[in-house]
Amino acid sequence: MSLNYEQNAADEQFARAHKAVSLSDDEESEGQAETTSAPNQEPHVSKSPREYYDEPGGKGNGSGADDQDEPETEAASGAANTHVVAHHYNELKEAGRKDRQKSKIFFMRNFNNWIKSQLINEYMSQIKQNKRMGDALRVLDMCCGKGGDLLKWEKAAISHLICTDIAEVSVEQCQRRYQDILQRSEKSKFANKFTAEFFACDSTLVRLRERYKDPSLQLNLVSCQFAFHYCFESMAQADCMMRNAAECLKPGGFFIATMPDAYEIIRRLRAAGPDARRFGNDVYSIEFDCETDPLPLFGAKYQFHLEGVVDCPEFLVHFPTLVKLGRKYGLQLLKRSTFADYYKENLHHGRHLLQRMSGLESVQPQRCENDEEFAHVSNFQGAQRSRSVGTLSKSEWEAATLYLVCAFKKCKNTWDTNGKPLFEFDD
């Protein structure tokens, strides 16, 4: 059995499942964003949509995925775990900097934050290059949490921000942080002042546009950081989430996200043993609640534990399915990179920011000799054993490299005689 979960894009079983659930009228686009598959080496993915709707979280029959008029009713049928996720994030305590510095994953959190900064900067730069002078710059921070990216939006000189999250407590904390930024900006004539709106709701169940102060507004960028995977509880929820990401994006606008890499998760699960349901290290662990052979396209539920954080149920994101859902709403895949690859791509021009954000731990040579977590540093240092090296511990790196970044572009469209959009994809 292959360890490469990615290659299912052109697998016959995967194609049958997609046709059965009618994800899109555009069957020609299937798998174009992915590499060629080797069907005889793939993990078994359920052929029948009925199988994976019977998995945890899946209750829909798949017949209404193309119905764009009633997403809330469709999505609600598969939302068995949304209240668990909301409770999890509402219960998280807001730790101070001193408490965070004591954590085993202090540097990993900073590293992840740097990844987000690089991703946001990459696509905000492209937007600014193409927009006209004086045009508004509007952003949706979908699943905004406590507002960890507010300073990034301020530095990006945006005009308006929409923040939404499933956890009411998080949205309240986010709004307070925004007010603090506003108060600080009053003291500086150079500070960027941007307007914002906040509301709590589940983006996998609710059409966000109907909650905006101006439902007709057009967005330049939609960002969903470390949260998109929750929508893969069911197809209807994933469809609703992708619609929310794409619906108000201007043509040429971007949807960017970070999420767990299902292919890497499955690779590590297989490496743990033929009957393994759990793997991890000192700072993280993953334990599957569903059958892993065959793997369902939706409802592939696992429990994720991170050091110092309450366990929370999550779902694998089958990436070819994500790409196909995106195309349904006019989103074309531009980028898919693992955190490891994205780090390499951005290190040269992002090194200074990485240092400022304490994204790597400075490790002295003598520590490497006695600490297994930093044994890899000795190999890197070579002859220069007197110099300290910036790195992550082995356990932190293993946790960080469970994730990927991705970016989509909203395509222009015309309309057919039935009033359906015909998107102009580049491929």
Swiss-Prot record:
Domain mRNA cap 0 methyltransferase: 103-411
Sites marked mRNA cap binding: 146, 152, 177, 229, 314, 403
Keyword list, A-Z: Methyltransferase, mRNA capping, mRNA processing, Nucleus, Phosphoprotein, RNA-binding, S-adenosyl-L-methionine, Transferase
Function: mRNA-capping methyltransferase that methylates the N7 position of the added guanosine to the 5'-cap structure of mRNAs. Binds RNA containing 5'-terminal GpppC.
Record field: catalytic activity: a 5'-end (5'-triphosphoguanosine)-ribonucleoside in mRNA + S-adenosyl-L-methionine = a 5'-end (N(7)-methyl 5'-triphosphoguanosine)-ribonucleoside in mRNA + S-adenosyl-L-homocysteine
Gene3D superfamilies: Vaccinia Virus protein VP39
Span list, region Disordered: 1-79
InterPro entries: mRNA_G-N7_MeTrfase_dom (IPR004971), mRNA_G-N7_MeTrfase_euk (IPR016899), RG7MT1 (IPR039753), SAM-dependent_MTases_sf (IPR029063)
Similarity comment: family membership: Belongs to the class I-like SAM-binding methyltransferase superfamily. mRNA cap 0 methyltransferase family.
Family annotation (PANTHER family): MRNA CAP GUANINE-N7 METHYLTRANSFERASE (PTHR12189:SF2), MRNA GUANINE-7- METHYLTRANSFERASE (PTHR12189)
CDD domains: AdoMet_MTases (cd02440)
Compartment(s) where it occurs, according to its Swiss-Prot or TrEMBL record: Nucleus
Name of this protein: mRNA cap guanine-N(7) methyltransferase
BP-aspect Gene Ontology terms: 7-methylguanosine mRNA capping
Enzyme Commission number: 2.1.1.56
Enzyme class: transferase
Residues that coordinate or bind S-adenosyl-L-methionine: 116, 143, 165, 202, 225, 230
Positions annotated to bind mRNA: 112-113
Biased composition, class Basic and acidic residues, residue ranges: 44-57
Origin: domain of life: Eukaryota
Species per Swiss-Prot/TrEMBL record: Drosophila melanogaster
A Pfam cross-reference name: mRNA_G-N7_MeTrfase
Any one of the GO CC terms: nucleus
